[in-house]
Amino acid sequence: LELECIRVCDRCGRGGAELRGEDGANVVITLDPARARELSRADGSDEIRSLTELFLDQLAANGLEPGEVVLDVVDGRLRALLSFVREGESDVVSCTPEEGVSLMVRGDLKAYATDEALAHAASRAGRADHHHGGSGGPDTVH
């Protein structure tokens, strides 16, 4: 998955990260507006480090190398999995999809999605189109 864009809806204030696969599959991760604004600054130029940046720094300081972020579904909910290497062994931790996007952006990590995550995203997009079919238009985040 490639990060297509990060937006904040002018109408409702919701934020979202649009991820697109090579096959055209689209996944939108809802972000709170503050996180969306933080992540939309490509260079991370803020006076205060984010928690994600601290976490990535601590991984490096402890000899842990982050690998990739994988979006998956568990119990009908989207989640992100961060893989990393510790002492030559692969390990995985789960986090929220929002945290996964932050890790992707700030850690310059590759992202993937399971077939279940893509199907989940497609079904959510279909419901969003049904409920917000009015003046929202194609750029509406929700």
Label for each model-derived stretch:
Residues L1-H142:
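Divalent-cation
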